[in-house]
From Swiss-Prot:
Residues 1-22 form the signal peptide. This is Metalloprotease TIKI2. Belongs to the TIKI family. GO terms for molecular function: metal ion binding; metalloendopeptidase activity; Wnt-protein binding. GO terms for biological process: negative regulation of Wnt signaling pathway; proteolysis; Wnt signaling pathway. The keyword Metal-binding applies. Pfam families: TraB_PrgY_gumN. The chain crosses the membrane at residues 500-517. It comes from Danio rerio. Residues 518 are cytoplasmic. Its cofactor is Mn(2+); Co(2+). Its main location: membrane.
């Protein structure tokens, strides 16, 4: 289902989700009653049907809120589709610590620069004043449950705003948007995307991503300096107005949760994802500032919606084509499946049969799906993300679309928290075929360098240089030469080769070569 055609991509400046008080957050929003039956639930699941015997795959829309706020409202059909799928793919690989390090480095200013020397003095002072206010308010914003779980205000502040003076201004702007009472109260619980990633890993499913970190980072870093200063200034003005009680947010995180749990798929709020980018267009702006706001909105709409939807749909299609026997579960932000030129639209244009899955519809694991679970991964290997090109054709501007869900810095501390428990890194292969055991023999056979001598004594590994090894072997042969020469013909006849000894020597040589190669 698509958004109503009359919806605009951006709303006015006051259509901003952050609110300055708990009263606005908790009392002015509609709460959902838990549905009585499955058919009363809201389904954000779409099925990609394929001809038999190939199994179906699924597209699931998420929102960036603590999973505990929405999990009980997600239909069993969506949960069943997740459980029966062989592979689960996200926008980014949330289980890979490399994702965290790349997100962090992408946000930092180059060459050791800092905001104090980069920003105009007045703007820097206002920013620091606002962050000092947030740090002061953090203990009062935290919930009793958070304090009971051992979370501290200073820890939360540093998790979100740590090292802020070294970050690029555009990322500081987004950081400011995540330093609100509503967001602080939600910290400590994995958001829905991250929870699904953790569950997929716990269940031993194949996980992956359809985007690279750079593809989400670079468009934001592509704004010019004057545009970034304008955006940061407008963001601070909004929050300063909220603090002063002059401005109140229209769309709140609570509104987003309520619409996800019991709203309808045509709601504007999913494309106005409230945990993400602020909106700057305001009729009260002077003409030159309104033009700057429109340029920023147009740029972000093109880079963060149309190009991403095109890229994500193309990579979903590639995975389905390369792995016809696999059942996939793609969990993306709900905004990517709503509105014009969505991921669903693009897949349908490519010939896929994509249908919305009602909440009461059963998900049955067919024989083909059970068979797919035994496939050799080397036969149906996934296309490496590093092999995908980030170039996408320019899309026509569509005026009736809004910013989609995007994993941005308000989730970075959640990723960092998860990443601390992920010591081993995933192996990133750049080759196009699986490595064979015969490759090892090719490398050994082609080598012209003498191999070192490797010994394991009492659990310790010692390596001797090749030249020393050759000298020792030569001395050993000289000592054994008199013993090996027969003294009479009868001795020569009795010197039959011992097959057990020969096999032992061969195995010892093989093990030493393998140890060297590894």
């Amino acid at each position: 289902m698509n958004c109503q055609s009359g919806l605009r991509w951006l709303v006015t400046l006051c259509a901003f989700f952050q609110v300055g008080s708990a009263r606005d957050t908790h009392e002015s929003t509609r709460q959902c009653d838990k549905p009585v039956s499955q058919k009363d639930m809201n389904s954000f699941l779409w099925t990609v049907k394929r001809p038999r015997p190939f199994p179906p795959s699924y597209l699931f829309g998420t929102i960036h809120v603590p999973y505990t706020r929405v999990w009980d409202y997600i239909p069993e059909s969506s949960k069943r589709a997740f459980q029966t799928s062989n592979s689960v793919f996200f926008e980014l690989d949330l289980t890979d610590p490399l994702t965290i390090s790349k997100l962090t480095s992408c946000q930092l200013l180059p060459n050791g620069e800092n905001l104090q020397t980069l920003l105009p003095r007045d703007l820097y002072r206002r920013l620091k004043r606002h962050l000092d206010y947030v740090k002061h308010m953090m203990p009062f914003w935290m919930t009793a449950d958070q304090r009971g779980r051992g979370l501290y205000a200073d820890y939360l502040f540093n998790a979100i705003a740590g090292n802020w003076e070294r970050k690029r201004p555009v990322w500081v702007m987004l950081m400011v948007n995540s330093l609100t009472e509503a967001d602080v109260r939600s910290r400590g619980t994995p958001v829905l995307d991250l929870f699904l990633a953790q569950e997929a890993e716990r269940l031993g499913k194949q996980t992956g991503a359809v985007e690279r970190v750079e593809e989400q980072c670079h468009p934001l870093n592509g704004l010019n300096f004057s545009q970034v200063l304008f955006a940061l200034n407008q963001t601070l003005l909004q929050h300063e107005s909220l603090r002063a009680g002059i401005l109140q947010g229209t769309f709140t995180t609570e509104d987003l949760i309520a619409h996800y749990n019991c709203g309808d798929l045509n709601s504007i709020i999913f494309n106005h994802d409230t945990s993400q980018l602020p909106h700057f267009i305001n009729s009260s702006l002077p003409d030159h500032e309104r033009l700057t706001a429109q340029q920023i909105d147009s740029y972000l709409r093109q880079e963060l919606i149309y190009k991403r939807n095109e890229r994500m749909a193309r990579r979903v299609s590639a995975l389905l084509q390369r792995n016809p026997n696999q059942s996939f579960f793609f969990a993306f932000g709900a905004g990517h499946f709503l509105g014009n030129h969505s991921v669903l639209d693009i897949l349908r244009q490519e010939g896929y049969e994509v249908e919305h899955t009602p909440p009461q519809e059963p998900i049955i694991q067919s024989w083909s799906e059970r068979e797919a679970t035994t496939l050799n991964p080397t036969e149906d290997s996934f296309e490496s993300v590093t092999e995908w090109t980030s170039e996408t054709p320019e899309l026509e501007e569509i005026s009736q679309e809004e910013l989609s869900h995007m994993l941005l810095p308000d989730s970075l501390s959640q990723l960092e928290e998860f990443g601390r428990y992920k010591h081993p890194r995933k192996t990133h292969h750049t080759h196009s075929r699986p490595r064979l055991f015969s490759d090892l023999w090719v490398r050994i056979g082609d080598s012209t360098t003498p191999h070192p001598s490797i010994r394991i004594t009492n659990g310790y590994v010692t390596v001797e240089p090749p030249q020393i090894r050759q000298e020792q072997q030569q001395r050993l042969r000289e000592r054994l030469k008199p013993l090996s020469e027969p003294t009479n013909p009868s001795a020569l006849d009795s010197a039959a080769p011992n097959p057990t000894y020969a096999l032992t020597c061969f195995l010892a040589c093989l093990i030493s070569q393998l140890l060297f190669a590894s």
